[in-house]
């Protein structure tokens, strides 16, 4: 059987994930580590696996991920989007299912920049009336 690769890129905050799906048994590696050791929190792992669970393809594909930037939650979000896009490349009929679950939408929220004259993005110095 010929090995077929499906690629997807996901971003969240400053994290960038490059995902490669190959036909296999459901093995998931992130930066050459097992995904359970890379993402210790079960909620983060579940969030990352959502596209595979919803499409019922968890044991059909092996997932290889290269991710950098951001924290673990942002990386999990980036991986989730990358997996969803790669699944869409392999099975275009999944689009309505993934779209309904909101897995194809890039979360555009990121840190607001600090403005001059303020202590943080919106926190102003204490005001004194007298």
From Swiss-Prot:
Recite the lineage of the species: Bacteria, Bacillati, Mycoplasmatota, Mollicutes, Acholeplasmatales
Q: Which Pfam family, an example, fits this chain?
A: Ribosomal_S9
Q: Which GO terms describe its molecular function?
A: RNA binding; structural constituent of ribosome
Under the heading SUPFAM superfamilies, the entry gives: Ribosomal protein S5 domain 2-like (SSF54211)
Cited HAMAP family: Ribosomal_uS9_B (MF_00532_B)
Give the protein name, as stated in the record.
Answer: Small ribosomal subunit protein uS9
Q: In its UniProt record, which GO terms are filed under biological process? A: translation
Q: What cellular-component terms does GO give this entry?
A: cytosolic small ribosomal subunit
The question of whether Ribonucleoprotein is a record keyword is answered with: yes
Q: Name the family the entry cites.
A: Belongs to the universal ribosomal protein uS9 family.
Keywords recorded for this protein, A-Z = Ribonucleoprotein, Ribosomal protein
**Gene that codes for this?**
rpsI
């Amino acid at each position: 059987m010929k090995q077929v690769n499906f690629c997807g890129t996901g971003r969240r905050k400053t994290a960038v994930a490059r995902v490669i799906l190959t036909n296999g048994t459901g093995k998931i590696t992130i930066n050459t580590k097992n995904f359970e050791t890379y993402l210790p929190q079960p909620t983060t792992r579940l969030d990352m696996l959502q596209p595979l669970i919803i499409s019922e393809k968890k044991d059909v594909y092996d997932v290889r991920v290269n991710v950098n930037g951001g924290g673990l939650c942002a990386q999990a979000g980036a991986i989730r989007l990358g997996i969803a896009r790669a699944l869409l490349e392999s099975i275009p009929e999944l689009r309505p299912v993934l779209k309904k679950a909101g897995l194809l939408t890039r979360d555009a929220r990121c840190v607001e920049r600090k403005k001059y004259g303020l202590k943080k993005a919106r926190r102003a110095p204490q005001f004194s009336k007298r």
